[in-house]
Amino acid sequence: MALVFKLDRSLESCWPVELRPVGEGSFEKETFESWWARNQSRLSHLPSDLCEQWIYKHWTNSPFDFLPLESLTWERQTWGGEELLRSIYRAWGGDLHPEFDYRTFQRKGGNDRHPTARALDVGTWDYPMVLLSTPHGVVDFGEVRPKVRLVIVEGHQRHRYLNALHVLNRPPMGPHEVIVLKSTLIS
């Protein structure tokens, strides 16, 4: 019998230390281009935009670093905004506050807008959101959620702003690209 995936447990990172960006956590972190040149052959089964936005940029703070990179499979998909918002689950994120989120990302509304706002304000985001397939649901904070099929791995800010735009009747044109990961840990 298939089991739901337990989000509310702490799993150790299994990412190979050799993949850690040089200078991670400092102002001298190597560029993605340098990092990719060193690691592309090891990660060649994954798209470069996924590797840049998730593994490289979020090396020290991804709660999904327990996923074995070598066995991940992926699929690039395109979704409409409302369908995406209905279909994805945001673990560990708490409640959304659309008006606050809108103001946070808009800042003063000019060139100082957050990059997420600048991208979505012209139709869609600049990097695909990364989602994890959870075919049997999840357990989050002790609550069983059997209908959850997709959990946000990377893209929480894009999710917050997309939600704010939809709630405030300002939905971006879209469509929105996502990368759906599948792991042998969750089957």
Task: Label every model-predicted segment.
Residues 129-131, 162, 178:
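Generic structural hydrophobic/aromatic packing signal, biased to beta-strands
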Residues 1-73:
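N-terminal leader/capping segments at the start of a protein or of a new domain
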Residues 136-137, 157-159, 185-186:
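Short, solvent-exposed loop/turn segments at secondary-structure junctions
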Residues 30, 48, 130-131, 152:
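Generic hydrophobic secondary-structure signal
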Residues 164-187:
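Alpha-helical oligomerization segments
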Residues 7, 12-28, 80, 135-138, ...:
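Intrinsically disordered, low-complexity acidic regions enriched in Pro/Ser/Thr
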Residues 33, 38, 57, 62-149, ...:
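Short alpha-helix boundary/capping and kink motifs at helix termini
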Residues 146-164:
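A sequence-level detector for short glycine-anchored, His/Arg-bearing signature motifs
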